[in-house]
Amino acid sequence: MLLNTLSPAAGSKHAPKRLGRGVGSGLGKTGGRGHKGQKSRSGGKVRPGFEGGQMPLKQRLPKFGFTSRKSFVSAEVRLSELAKVTGDVVDLNALKAANLVTKNIEFAKIVLSGEINKAVTVKGLRVTKGAKAAIEAAGGKIEE
């Protein structure tokens, strides 16, 4: 096989439409754009979501919901990630030092995901039931 003999498989490539090249081509004169109107002009297009002056669907449907501002300062930490914390005490500052949560986080919750091998003391963090059972089974404890 030589590089200069390579060619695409037969029928896999299509020649581009040649617009405005005579009436015999079927795409002469107006080039498949029809007669007059905004879409026949060069640069003529309507913005996404425009429905010809009718009230658009996006505006016909009601607004709903909101984003809680508390979600920006809250985080979940997996049980398996606690292995990255140096030391036996896990609190918010220890999580920040281990880069498990960002500096703007004020509330963290430990959730049961993965396993924990070392005994740790969790201070001042919320813990799910399953995570609490797993921490205590590993010899750790939870302090409020």
UniProtKB/Swiss-Prot annotation:
The keyword Transcription does not apply. Residues 32-44 have a biased composition (Basic residues). Residues 21-31 have a biased composition (Gly residues). Residues 1-57 are annotated as: Disordered. GO terms for molecular function: rRNA binding; structural constituent of ribosome. InterPro entries: Ribosomal_uL15 (IPR030878), Ribosomal_uL15/eL18 (IPR021131), Ribosomal_uL15/eL18_sf (IPR036227), Ribosomal_uL15_bac-type (IPR005749), Ribosomal_uL15_CS (IPR001196). Keywords: Ribonucleoprotein, Ribosomal protein, RNA-binding, rRNA-binding. GO terms for biological process: translation. The keyword Ribonucleoprotein applies. One of its GO terms (cellular component) is cytosolic large ribosomal subunit. Belongs to the universal ribosomal protein uL15 family. Part of the 50S ribosomal subunit. Binds to the 23S rRNA. This is Large ribosomal subunit protein uL15. It comes from Vibrio cholerae serotype O1 (strain ATCC 39315 / El Tor Inaba N16961). The gene is rplO.
